[in-house]
Curated annotation (Swiss-Prot):
EC number: 3.4.11.9
Alphabetic keyword roster: Aminopeptidase, Hydrolase, Manganese, Metal-binding, Metalloprotease, Protease
Pfam families, sorted: AMP_N, Peptidase_M24
GO MF entries: manganese ion binding; metalloaminopeptidase activity
Record text on cofactor binding: Binds 2 manganese ions per subunit.
Source organism of this protein record: Paracoccidioides brasiliensis (strain Pb18)
Functional note: Catalyzes the removal of a penultimate prolyl residue from the N-termini of peptides.
Protein name, per record: Probable Xaa-Pro aminopeptidase PADG_06815
Broad class of enzyme this protein falls into: hydrolase
Amino acid sequence: MGTYPAFSGSPQLPEQRLHGTTNLNPAGGYRIELQIQDATFDKYPAKQHAQRVAAKIKKGKGLIFLMGQKAALLEDSDQETRFRQRRYFFYMSGVNEADCDLTYDIQSDKLTLYVPNFDLGREIWMGPTLGPQDALKRYDIDEAKYQSFLQGDIKQWASCSGHGSTIYTLHDSQKPTGDFPNVFMDSETLKPAMDACRVIKDEHEIEQMRHANRVSTAAHIAVLQGICKMTNEAQIEGSFLNTCVSLGAHNQAYGIIAASGANAATLHYSKNNEPLKGRQFVCLDAGAEWNCHASDVTRTFPLTARWPGTEAEQIYALVQNMQESCILRIKEGVRYLDLHHLAHDILIHGFLAIGIFKAGTADEIKKSGASSLFFPHGLGHHIGLEVHDVSPDSIFAQDNDGTTDSWLFSSTYLSPCTASSPTLKSGMVVTVEPGIYFSQIALDNAKPAQLKHIDMDVVKRYMAVGGVRIEDDILVTKDGFENLTSAPKGQAMLDYIQQGNGSCDI
């Protein structure tokens, strides 16, 4: 198994600057100051994305058709559903408006956006909607038209392209309306081509994700500074949302997880409504969205500015070691599955050291699946326009002998195994989110082969820890990585709790 580096002290937090300032403070952490202001990002590179997708399709002719999300009412109500743009449409348009569609003519390299027809009543009630002239100014497109032109334009394209021309769509349910008898509708080719493009982020996409992480960092810090005065998980969720919205991020990338005590052992806990009194840790998994790009950040922290006990401090240090050891090894060409193995190896050696594991070698314990009782999910996932973003292949893969150990993923939320063995590539953004959870239901359903390696008397001392997870968003580079996430961990995290309330003595 070998040995793994130990980590001490607080991690170094990089200084970053965009839409505000970030400054180191005397406590060893940093202060982030963001203001709402007009975005200074360049136009979303929709045309470049369309060209990349066409190159993946590898055909000299054809028409790509993508439907945007439509405005809709709630069932039996006159209230609209919360709008969320279709991510494939956004990737090739950069448009976050309802009721739009697009076409891209591969041969002529022409990207056309179709916007909602003018509706005076809607304009009066809801305000101005996107029109063709405004769309041309705002977006990286060649032409903008009203929706009323769409069907006729496609018919004209089909007539000019000849018999057997192809229209590429994502799904059969998202074909353009109308009768196109001489056109072949292909709903198999476009999605994998777009997935292959989306997995490698360009600089514009990366900058959106950097900023989403900046907002999330500010929100996590606000929670730390206020946690001493909070009495319920709901206040944690409310504080995080308040900071994000105040900084212009009105949407979350996923539902906030504010899990205290034993609730932190539930991976996707969502109630966020229990009192904090008597709990050791809070696991806050929450990430803002910026221009449809996700962040995914998890921090676990005590309710006061000191560790609640030896057991809690040991588990936190072990998870931090797991995470930082894996992050340090990230670069192009690394197999992500190897990092997942590494995280389990560190957990096993740590549990042997503190007495939770017994009776067997580290390799025997690993093969029994005992470590998966405490770390039941994958090390991470792709992130981008979706929090669990797309890719042609999973970042997990089979082992070199063509098999995948079943113990690795006995309880994963998303099945990560595929027949291929991909490695990390420059431009990918992945999460690294190891965790250790003391789940009573998992232990109650453990197999005898697992239980023989576990000292349940020792485990009882750790049950109050609940769960610890630490998660950052990592950009893969040619020679290493860039950590997009700067929310404080370790001692720097405790310093922020201390700053929030003088009664929280370290």
